Curated annotation (Swiss-Prot):
This is Large ribosomal subunit protein bL32. Keywords: Ribonucleoprotein, Ribosomal protein. GO terms for molecular function: structural constituent of ribosome. It comes from the Bacteria. The gene is rpmF. SUPFAM superfamilies: Zn-binding ribosomal proteins. GO terms for biological process: translation. It comes from Buchnera aphidicola subsp. Baizongia pistaciae (strain Bp). GO terms for cellular component: large ribosomal subunit.
Amino acid sequence: MAVQKNKPTRSKRGMRRSHDYLKIPLLSKDKLSGEIHIRHHITKNGYYKGKKVI
């Protein structure tokens, strides 16, 4: 089993944890229906960039 030689510093621990936070998803409003959706994703109606894709 691997055992560390030195105790990691508070700085190194913080740098490792710097990406562990939860991000709020970026939202966009559809031009045609006005529906709010996640950026770069289709809406529930099947529209993407104002065009019907599904």
